[in-house]
């Protein structure tokens, strides 16, 4: 893991294994029995899943000192984002990767469809 010490990696791996074990200890309910019995099993399973999720979040924040939720990425406004195909992008799916372009000006083609 880039930018972290080896001890932190070991703690992360240990914590992930614990969380994985928690989720594996709660398999989905069997689809048998009456409708009411299936509904009750699903309801109890969802409650256990919610508890496991909150325990996992607690483990990540307490043991590793980080949030369970990813840090939100600040993006520019959608009006400023456009696709620039003026360069030869290729069709293989691998060319042009790693050099995204953000243009400030929106092309007139896109603007004509947004006016009401």
UniProtKB/Swiss-Prot annotation:
Annotated segments matching region Disordered: 20-48, 91-116
Record family assignment: Belongs to the HIV-1 REV protein family.
Protein name per Swiss-Prot or TrEMBL: Protein Rev
Subcellular location per the Swiss-Prot or TrEMBL entry: Host nucleus, Host nucleolus; Host cytoplasm
Gene name of this polypeptide: rev
One BP annotation, GO: viral process
Function: Escorts unspliced or incompletely spliced viral pre-mRNAs (late transcripts) out of the nucleus of infected cells. These pre-mRNAs carry a recognition sequence called Rev responsive element (RRE) located in the env gene, that is not present in fully spliced viral mRNAs (early transcripts). This function is essential since most viral proteins are translated from unspliced or partially spliced pre-mRNAs which cannot exit the nucleus by the pathway used by fully processed cellular mRNAs. Rev itself is translated from a fully spliced mRNA that readily exits the nucleus.
Free-text description of this protein's post-translational modifications in UniProt: Asymmetrically arginine dimethylated at one site by host PRMT6. Methylation impairs the RNA-binding activity and export of viral RNA from the nucleus to the cytoplasm. Phosphorylated by protein kinase CK2. Presence of, and maybe binding to the N-terminus of the regulatory beta subunit of CK2 is necessary for CK2-mediated Rev's phosphorylation.
GO cellular component: host cell cytoplasm; host cell nucleolus
Entry keyword set: AIDS, Host cytoplasm, Host nucleus, Host-virus interaction, Methylation, mRNA transport, Phosphoprotein, RNA-binding, Transport
Positions of short motif Nuclear export signal and binding to XPO1: 73-84
Annotated region described as Homomultimerization, given as residue ranges: 18-26
A molecular function (GO) term: DNA-binding transcription factor activity
Comp. bias intervals (Basic residues): 36-48
Domain remark text: The RNA-binding motif binds to the RRE, a 240 bp stem-and-loop structure present in incompletely spliced viral pre-mRNAs. This region also contains the NLS which mediates nuclear localization via KPNB1 binding and, when the N-terminal sequence is present, nucleolar targeting. These overlapping functions prevent Rev bound to RRE from undesirable return to the nucleus. When Rev binds the RRE, the NLS becomes masked while the NES remains accessible. The leucine-rich NES mediates binding to human XPO1.
Oligomer and partners: Homomultimer; when bound to the RRE. Multimeric assembly is essential for activity and may involve XPO1. Binds to human KPNB1, XPO1, TNPO1, RANBP5 and IPO7. Interacts with the viral Integrase. Interacts with human KHDRBS1. Interacts with human NAP1; this interaction decreases Rev multimerization and stimulates its activity. Interacts with human DEAD-box helicases DDX3 and DDX24; these interactions may serve for viral RNA export to the cytoplasm and packaging, respectively.
Motif (Nuclear localization signal and RNA-binding (RRE)): 34-50
Residue(s) carrying Phosphoserine: 5, 8, 92, 99
Further information: HIV-1 lineages are divided in three main groups, M (for Major), O (for Outlier), and N (for New, or Non-M, Non-O). The vast majority of strains found worldwide belong to the group M. Group O seems to be endemic to and largely confined to Cameroon and neighboring countries in West Central Africa, where these viruses represent a small minority of HIV-1 strains. The group N is represented by a limited number of isolates from Cameroonian persons. The group M is further subdivided in 9 clades or subtypes (A to D, F to H, J and K).
């Amino acid at each position: 893991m880039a930018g972290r010490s080896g001890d932190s990696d070991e703690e992360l791996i240990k914590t992930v294994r614990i969380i994985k074990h928690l989720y594996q200890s709660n398999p989905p309910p069997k689809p048998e029995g009456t409708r009411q019995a299936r509904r009750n099993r699903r309801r109890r399973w969802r409650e256990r899943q919610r508890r496991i999720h909150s325990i996992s979040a607690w483990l990540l924040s307490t043991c590793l000192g980080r949030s369970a939720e990813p840090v939100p990425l600040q993006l520019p406004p959608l009006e400023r984002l456009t696709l620039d195909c003026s360069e030869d992008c290729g069709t293989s799916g691998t060319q042009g990767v790693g050099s995204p372009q953000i243009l400030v000006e929106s092309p007139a083609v896109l603007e004509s469809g947004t006016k009401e």
